[in-house]
A protein has these predicted regions:
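Post-signal peptide N-terminal segment of secreted/secretory-pathway proteins
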Residues: 96-136, 387, 402
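N-terminal secretory signal peptides that target proteins for export/translocation
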Residues: 1-10
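Sec/Tat signal peptide C-region and signal peptidase I cleavage site
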Residues: 27-31
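Primarily the internal scaffold of c-type cytochrome electron-transfer domains
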Residues: 33-36, 57-96, 125-133, 141-388
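Bacterial N-terminal signal peptides
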Residues: 12-25
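Residues immediately within or flanking Cys/His clusters that coordinate Zn2+
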Residues: 41-50, 103, 107, 132, ...
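Cys/His/Pro-rich metal-binding microdomains
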Residues: 46-54, 111, 136, 178, ...
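A cross-kingdom marker for long, charged
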Residues: 375-449
Length: 449
């Protein structure tokens, strides 16, 4: 597959450095019902579109919110096209290849992530699935809060009690994004889907939110309503969420009992989908030649976060990650051992995440993470394209976080190198591990890592 849409958008992101999304610091990431699983009715995006609500053409300055949120979503957010894309030739071909009884724009497996796919009994009279990934797909069915959220005494806490999804909580937001961009038990993304022709899927939550683009502004009023924010937390919680979803899917017995092979979607795509003529296996890799490896790109990032923000847990997490890889690549590997290793790591990461959520991502913490991400090139951690792609987005996000903290020197040094790194990621099939790592090693000296 040639450069995907994300790669093509990276240049746009580089021009907007310093404007990425900032979300409120989480409490402990309390469990929250996903919008598509809510018991409440979805009333339809049209109810948000009035110019006196969120459909203003221009931003309003005299109100607590911009009031042009719907307009920004409609004009600029790719999520508006999520349903429409199901009608194009590629989507219809995927549905045919999968042997679906319905066309893509009617099949549940497609609609689950390409629309706000709720049961008919939960659809209000003005609900329209063709709106794609609409307001209620992210903010939750509005049946109980659409009237009360504009009342003078309304509060964010009360709105959440009424069914508003807490997108201002970094981990809750990240779990929502990754439920489709990684997959979860309710919306699994399988190797069958990919094999039928679906483009490769990847995500780094903070980067994707910056590209979305944001339809709100973090200002004094926002903070007053939703609480203080921490610039680096959305990136960190995004990595924890991606890792959690991956581990949950690995441990899902319903997904790993379909023949002699496990669900291949959890593995690094390029371990198999690499040209036969490409002979770049390195003895430094933590696997033998010919072995498929679980896609650990987010786990690599999480370990860097833990080393900086919760170092007391670093050794234990590192051992558990290694145990997962050993279980999945052992000649005597079996599903039960892999699932056990995934469950143990998942439980421990959930505990550590709650610790990390309480740690302020200061300039010192972010700088330590950045240098660690750069240093990992020397240890061959970015041997696979997925790891390199995640490193690129993460280094950019953390550098932007440093800029917001006032450390413009390191941020400018990093940003001056990003174009060259991006070029090395423009074609996943032609990824040059040594060239990418060489660029990062040059950056290592520049930032004093």
């Amino acid at each position: 597959m040639k450069a995907n849409a994300l790669n093509r958008c990276f240049n746009c992101l580089l021009l907007a450095l310093g404007t990425s999304v900032l979300l409120a610091a989480p409490t402990a990431g309390m469990a929250q019902t996903m919008p598509h699983q809510s018991p409440h009715q979805s009333v339809g995006t049209v109810n948000c579109a009035s110019s006196t609500c969120h459909g203003s053409i221009a931003e309003r300055t005299a109100t607590p919110v911009l009031q042009n949120e719907y307009t920004t979503w409609l004009r600029e957010d790719p999520h508006t096209q999520a349903y429409a894309v199901l009608k194009n030739a590629q989507s219809q071909r995927i549905a045919k290849n999968m042997g679906l009884a319905q066309p893509a724009h009617e099949a549940k497996v497609c609609l689950d992530c390409h629309s706000h796919n709720v049961p008919a009994s939960k659809q209000g009279p003005r609900f329209d699935k063709s709106d794609g990934v609409n307001c209620e797909a992210c903010h939750g069915p509005a049946e109980k809060w659409i009237k009360t959220h504009v009342e003078p005494k309304a509060s964010n806490t009360k709105n959440i009690e009424n069914g508003l999804y807490p997108t201002s909580d970094p981990y809750a937001a990240a779990k929502l994004c990754t439920s489709c961009h990684v997959g979860d038990s309710s919306r699994p993304i399988t190797h069958q889907i990919m094999g039928a022709g679906h483009p490769r899927i990847s995500i780094e939550v903070e980067t994707f939110m910056a590209l979305e683009p944001p339809h709100y502004r973090i200002d004094e009023d926002w903070v007053k309503r939703k609480g203080a924010y921490d610039a680096g937390k959305i990136w960190a919680m995004g990595q924890f969420a991606s890792s959690a979803n991956l581990l949950e899917l690995i441990a899902d017995t319903k997904r790993n009992r379909q023949g002699i092979m496990p669900e291949l979607m959890m593995f690094d795509c390029h371990a198999c989908h690499s040209p036969m003529s490409k002979k770049d296996w390195s003895k430094d890799l933590a696997r033998s030649p010919g072995q498929a490896r679980i896609n650990n790109s987010s786990l690599i990032m999480v370990q860097a976060i833990i080393r900086a923000a919760a170092p007391q847990h670093s050794s234990d997490i590192g051992k558990l990650v290694n145990q997962l890889h050993i279980a999945s690549t052992s000649p005597a590997a079996n599903f039960n051992e892999v699932e056990r290793a995934a469950n143990v790591l998942h439980a421990q990461l959930n505990t550590v995440r709650k610790v990390v959520a309480t740690v302020p991502f200061t300039e010192q913490v972010l700088e330590k993470i950045l240098k660690d991400l750069v240093n990992m090139a020397a240890n061959n951690q970015y041997a696979d394209f997925a790891g390199a792609e995640q490193a690129y987005m993460s280094i950019s996000s953390v550098a932007n976080g440093l800029a917001r903290k006032g450390n413009s020197r390191i941020a400018q040094t990093v940003n001056s190198k990003m174009d060259r790194l991006l070029k090395l990621l423009s074609n996943d099939e032609a990824y040059d591990r040594e060239a990418f790592q060489s660029e990062l090693l040059a950056l290592k000296a520049a930032v004093g890592a």
